[in-house]
Amino acid sequence: IGKRLSGRDRLDEQRAALDEIAAICDAEKVDLVLVAGDVFDTFLPSAEAEDAFYSAAKKIAGTDRCMLIISGNHDDNIRLTAATALSEELGIYVYGNAGHIPKLCGGRRVYPVEAGANHIVFRTGEEEVFFNVLPYPNETRLKEDKNPDEKFLDKMVRWMNVGQAENKKNLPSVFLSHLFI
């Protein structure tokens, strides 16, 4: 959101596309919307782009749907997760910071029943699904890792395995990430 084309502002078109996504979610009775990064076009999106995103996310989540969002390479992971105290109350769960554990909020058709730094489990009725999440591994996260000499691909596989190891109930599993391989 916020991308310009040849210097031309496209925010109105982006808002219209997001409104269409919200309408499709309502018409199709979508339970959960996944966003695998690159919410914004830049680390420092305009206030208008941020407003478009937060307004659209609230509309898409509605009153009984959840959203699961992870940061991409164009997103500032800290900035993207800055509003989690508010967004989680609206059923919008954002992973960007390594170590952030979402607050479990119910009251929706689909709701989280378990969450950790790299996973979240959603339930609807009697069914549960496990999400192993790996936001874009930015340079800061790579530097914080304890194995600086490990190859990038090996590191990604290890991080995926750490997340998957949290699936103690052997639930159906979805891996959600934003990677370059």
Task: Go through each PLM region and give its residues.
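Hydrophobic "anchor" residues on beta-strands that sit immediately upstream
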Residues: L34, L68, V174
